[in-house]
Structures are given as C-alpha cells and as structure tokens.
C-alpha cells in the first residue's frame, strides 16, 4: 500500500512524494500554495474540546470551547463558566463540548464529560448567551476520554456516546418535558477500551458501535440486545474510530489512529467463503498522538475524506510529544488504490521543551499559534461559502482552518 503526499490539492492531484506505507522514513516538499487559511480564535486557550453552533441566533456559526463561547465572525470571547483543572494539572475537566438543544427551548446547550470527576453534564444556555451558563449533572459512569453525538438510530435525535473506561454505553434524551430524562443503555463491557467509533459494519442499514476490541451490532429492534463481535484488536485507538467504505467495494472499512503512539491504520473488510476477513494496513507512521479523526467531504468530489493530526501533549511524556504539530487530510484514491495526504497545517517542534515532562506546557514550549487536533475537532462550513472548514482546539490554542477550495 502506498501513500501519496499532495502538494496543492486533492483536486489537482500533484504528487510530490510517494512512500511505502510500511516504511517509517518521511521527507516533505514545500507546498507552493496554501489550501487552508489558519485563523486564531484564541491562541491562549488550553482546552481540548470544541463545539460549533449558532449560540446567539444571528445565523452565524459560533464556537464553544472550555469556559467560553466565541461569537462569529470576529471571535469575541464570552466566558460563561469555570472549568477546573484535573487532579493531573496538565488537563482541564472539559473532555467534550457537544452542542444540542437539550431542554427544547430553542437555544443550543452543551453536553460535556470529564475524565477526573467521571461526570457527564449538560451546560444550559441561559437565554442570553452572554450570561453565565448553568451546569446540570446527568450521570457519573466513569473516567471518559471524550464523548460525541451520533444519530445512532437515524431518527434525527442523536445519542451521546462517551468513551468510558471499562464500559460501553450511550445516553438517549428520551423526554424534555415536564422534566428532562436521560436513558443510559449499557452494552456488554467486553469491547471496552481506549477508542470509540461507529459505522454500518455489516451493511444492514443500521449504525453499529466500533471499539478497539471489535464491534457491536445494532439489533433490528431498538430494545433488542446488541451483539458483540470480537473480530479485531486496534490497541489504544482514536476517538473517533471511523467506519466507512473508503475503497468503494460495498463493505465498511475501519480507520483509526494510535491515540498515544505513532501510527494511522485501516482495516480493509472483505469476504472469504462467506466469512468476514479484516486486513490491516498502515496508512502513515510519521506523527504520533493520533487521537481525533473526523469524516467529511472536504474537496467536494462526492467521496469522504478524514481529518486527523497530532494531539499536542496528549501525554507530555509520550514518544514524539515535542515533535512538530500537524493537521492532515487523508483520502483514498480508488483508481490507484493509494491513500493521499494533504497538509492543513504543519508547525514547528518544541526542541527547548523541558526534559522533565511534568514541567512541560504546550503554550510555553511550542511557538505561539501552534495548532493540533485536541480531543475533538468540528467540521462545519463556518463561513457559509459552501465548503467544509475545520475548528481545532488543543493545549496550544483554538484555531479555525478556512477551506479555500471555493475561493480558489
């Protein structure tokens, strides 16, 4: 399997470098024209989660991250809550910022979760978004890497899917009046681990849940039992693990990164004598801390790509922690059977970072304006110009990457 590095766009397909996917040596040519424009929303923000919605009902997409929301288009900051540090001070208790009108009042609230307090909460929009927002507890299932909303039942009503240590579960908002009611659905914990995703794995039209240990088959009946299939081992995987038919052979493949190591991989699904066979192949091994992946059609060619990159200081002590930060888009060329990579952003490493990981601080160690993927990104058309942009949080700041496809 080969990986092609694109220098201008996936539209022009200008090849500047080819490497064997099983190799580890990489070199990159300078890109002559930018495909993306980086905007600083708050280069001093230390939070790693983000949500995008119209919080002030003016028709523009705003950004929620950590303790504040930022009003489009000039990103005026409005602090609306306090977010404590975790017992490990390198992290804040904001591991998800998922926008949803929880109480049905027409204003967008935020669903959040935390690792150290083990809590899921919703942050209520007060009506005037510039006033303090109100935190309401939902549950305390365990330490969570992050969580996200997914329309699991394709009903238009998303569920909250958290990555909980030792458990696999999701939460449905089953009632808004007269009182909010969240219904947790516990699945067999055999598949629990670092990493979580979804996709129609068996092509039956229903969305399944993917974990590092296998996948859970959604039953035909909403109240039926979810069947766990322990068909693979992914390791300490990303959130999300993406289930999608990348190669166009009518079955769902799986793509994931190593959240705390080097490596971006895919499992190609095929059938042999009627049985499912998963073939593991390396996509890229040139960067580490591949913690967040998101699917979108960034180049408007009708096929889905995914964005990922380096979560800066996912753990300060990990291999590659001080290497150059990066955000990349990968797409699969079905004609050549190659993965293509295009740069959204590549920064500078932090060679002067303290040798003691406990003394490291992303805002001090990396150059101002350095961007990574954080725990989650938002992929939305931020400027309403017809193409998908990227909002990326992290310990080194909060940034919007404007897609220049339409403007070129």
Predicted features along the sequence, with ranges:
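N-terminal secretory signal peptides that target proteins for export/translocation
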Residues: 1-11
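Compositionally biased regions
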Residues: 8-10, 26-28, 156
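Bacterial N-terminal signal peptides
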Residues: 12-26
């Amino acid at each position: 399997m080969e990986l092609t590095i694109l220098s201008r766009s996936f539209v022009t397909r200008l090849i500047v470098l080819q490497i064997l996917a099983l190799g580890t040596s990489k070199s990159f040519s300078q890109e002559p024209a930018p495909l993306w424009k980086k905007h600083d929303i708050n280069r001093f923000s230390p939070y790693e989660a983000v949500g995008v919605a119209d919080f002030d009902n003016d028709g523009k997409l705003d950004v929620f991250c950590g303790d504040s929301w930022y009003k489009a288009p000039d990103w005026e900051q409005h602090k609306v809550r306090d977010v404590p540090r975790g017992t490990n001070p390198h992290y804040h208790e904001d591991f998800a910022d998922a926008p949803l009108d929880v109480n049905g009042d027409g204003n967008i609230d935020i669903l959040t979760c935390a690792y150290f307090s083990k809590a899921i909460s919703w942050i209520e929009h007060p009506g005037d978004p510039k006033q303090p927002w109100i935190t309401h507890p939902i549950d305390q299932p365990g330490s969570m890497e992050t969580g996200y909303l997914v329309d699991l039942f394709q009903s238009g009503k998303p569920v909250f899917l958290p990555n909980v240590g030792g458990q696999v579960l999701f939460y449905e908002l089953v009632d808004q009046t007269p009182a909010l009611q969240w219904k947790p659905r516990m699945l067999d914990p055999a598949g629990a681990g670092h990493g979580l995703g979804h996709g129609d794995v068996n092509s039956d039209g229903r969305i399944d849940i993917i974990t590092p240990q296998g996948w859970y088959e959604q039953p035909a009946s909403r109240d039926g039992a979810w069947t766990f299939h322990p068909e693979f081992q992914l390791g300490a995987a990303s959130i999300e693990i993406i289930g999608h038919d990348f190669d166009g052979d009518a079955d769902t493949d799986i793509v994931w990164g190593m959240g705390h190591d080097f490596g971006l991989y895919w499992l190609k699904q095929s059938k042999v004598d009627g049985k499912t066979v998963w073939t593991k192949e390396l996509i890229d091994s040139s960067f580490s801390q591949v913690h967040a992946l998101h699917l979108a059609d960034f180049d408007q060619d009708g096929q889905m790509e995914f964005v990922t990159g380096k979560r800066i200081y996912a753990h300060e002590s990990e291999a590659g922690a001080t290497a150059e930060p990066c955000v990349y888009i990968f797409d699969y060329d079905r004609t050549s059977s190659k993965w293509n990579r295009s740069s959204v952003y590549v920064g500078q490493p932090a060679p002067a970072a303290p040798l003691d990981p406990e003394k490291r601080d992303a805002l001090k160690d990396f150059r101002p304006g350095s961007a990574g993927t954080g725990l989650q990104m938002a992929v939305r058309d931020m400027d309403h110009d017809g193409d998908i942009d990227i909002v990326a949080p992290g310990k080194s700041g909060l940034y919007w990457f404007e897609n220049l496809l339409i403007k070129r």
